[in-house]
A protein has these predicted regions:
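Class I SAM-dependent methyltransferase SAM/SAH-binding core
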Residues: 55-100
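Core SAM-dependent methyltransferase catalytic element
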Residues: 192-213
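A short glycine-rich, Lys/Arg-flanked "PGG" loop and its adjoining helix->strand segment in the class I
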Residues: 126-138
Length: 213
C-alpha cells in the first residue's frame, strides 16, 4: 500500500521543497513545470477534495487558497510536521495511505494527488481505483499527477538515459517504485466505471483525469 517507501521520505522531508523547485539536477526534468502542474490540478478540482500523500502541503495550500474544502492524508510523520507548519494549526492532517485511510466525514467530489500513485503496485492501483469509485458521486473526479509512461520501451529508455547521465538516484528510483504504463492505468479506470483522459506536462509527468460515469 505504499508504506514500504516511508523511509525514503523520512530522509527527504526537509529537502523536498528544494527538489520540486528543480534544485537537484537528477530530478530537474521530473519536477519541470511543477507549479503549473499543481495549478492545473486545482483548476480541475471540485469544491470538496480528498488529497492523498500531501507531502509538505504544497498542493494542499493551493487548494485551500482557492477556497476548496480539503481532507488531507499523509503517512509520513516528518512530512506531516512540515505541512502543519505551512498550513497552520487549524488544519487536521490525517495519517493514512492510498488504500488504508480515515474516510472523510462529508461527501467529496474530487480525489487528488501529486507524485504519489506510483507507490502502489498495479494490482493495488486497481483496488484503490475501485475503492475511490465507491466514495465519489456520479461525475465525481479523480485527478492525479504522476510519472507514467506510454510504453514499456519508453520506460526502459528513461532508465537507460538516467544511467548514461550517471543519475544513479533517479535510475534506482525508476527501478524501485511502480511507475505505471498509461494503457494499464486507462484499463483500470475504465473497468471500474470511469471515463479517463491523460495530458503530458514533461518527459515524466502526466495528469490523469477520471470522471465517474
Amino acid at each position: 500500500m505504499g508504506r514500504e517507501f516511508l523511509d525514503v521520505f523520512t530522509g527527504w522531508a526537509e529537502s523536498y521543497d528544494s527538489f520540486v523547485q528543480g534544485q537537484d539536477a537528477e530530478y530537474k526534468e521530473v519536477f519541470r513545470r511543477y507549479d503549473e502542474i499543481l495549478d492545473e490540478i486545482v483548476k480541475r478540482s471540485g469544491e470538496n477534495v480528498l488529497e492523498f500523500g500531501i507531502g509538505t502541503g504544497n498542493l494542499t495550500k493551493l487548494l485551500f487558497d482557492s477556497n476548496k474544502q480539503v481532507f488531507p492524508i499523509e503517512p509520513s510523520p516528518e512530512m506531516r510536521l512540515i505541512a502543519s507548519k505551512k498550513l497552520g494549526e487549524n488544519v487536521d492532517i490525517h495519517d493514512g495511505d492510498l488504500i488504508d485511510f480515515p474516510k472523510p466525514t462529508q461527501q467529496i467530489d474530487t480525489i487528488v494527488s501529486s507524485y504519489v500513485f506510483h507507490h502502489l503496485t498495479d494490482d493495488e492501483k486497481y483496488e484503490a481505483i475501485k475503492l475511490y469509485h465507491s466514495l465519489l458521486p456520479v461525475n465525481g473526479k479523480i485527478i492525479f499527477a504522476d510519472t507514467m509512461f506510454q510504453t514499456e520501451e519508453a520506460f526502459q529508455n528513461e532508465i537507460t538515459k538516467a544511467d548514461q547521465a550517471n543519475f544513479i538516484d533517479l535510475r534506482d528510483d525508476l527501478k524501485r517504485e511502480y511507475y505505471p504504463l498509461i494503457p494499464v492505468i486507462r484499463s483500470h479506470f475504465e473497468k471500474n466505471g470511469f471515463s479517463v483522459s491523460f495530458q503530458q506536462f514533461n518527459d515524466f509527468v502526466w495528469i490523469v483525469e477520471a470522471t465517474k460515469l
